[in-house]
């Protein structure tokens, strides 16, 4: 169970900019769901990324030679989202809320608990964050964009197709009026996707 008052989420196929946690915490509020995005590193650059590169600061700037070369070769996408700008400028550039993406978001623990977190009945790949987002909206938790602030780099991998079951679950979530899921954060034992 999370001990802090703000919960920050990231995917296992990504790595954050060194200021990522600070960016989320500086923008945190009592009710806001903070929605970041990702720079999509390409299939040629991703296998060559090392922990040493990250620790050496080679991803501290979107304009580093390693990233620029990859972008100019058509390998890396959404590089503009990797440019960190001061908060007042980011708010002017991105005034409207963005969709919640599980790869990069944070929210008050109280909001997560209020909607009972992720729905553990959602046992198919992908888009479980859409269900969570809809319940947070229904519960009155506004979204706030963190584009050009909380930067995350996504390592390339083949994408999976949305299954019919996933599409059915998304449609059911969109048609529902539920704020809380039945099987979520309050479970004693969470769903283990590995079995």
What are these regions (language model features)?
Residues 19-69:
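Conserved donor NDP-sugar-binding/catalytic core segment of glycosyltransferases
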Residues 11-15:
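The conserved acidic donor/metal-binding loop of glycosyltransferases
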Residues 99-100, 104-116, 123-142, 147:
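A short, conserved alpha-helix in the catalytic core of glycosyltransferases
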Residues 1:
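Active-site-proximal specificity loops/subdomain of glycosyltransferases
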Residues 146-163:
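Active-site donor/metal-binding and catalytic loop motifs
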Residues 7:
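Short aromatic/hydrophobic "clamp" motif used to bind/position activated sugar donors
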Residues 103, 138-142, 163-195:
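Terminal low-complexity segments of carbohydrate-biosynthetic enzymes
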Residues 54-97:
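Short, flexible, basic/aromatic active-site loop/helix in glycosyltransferases
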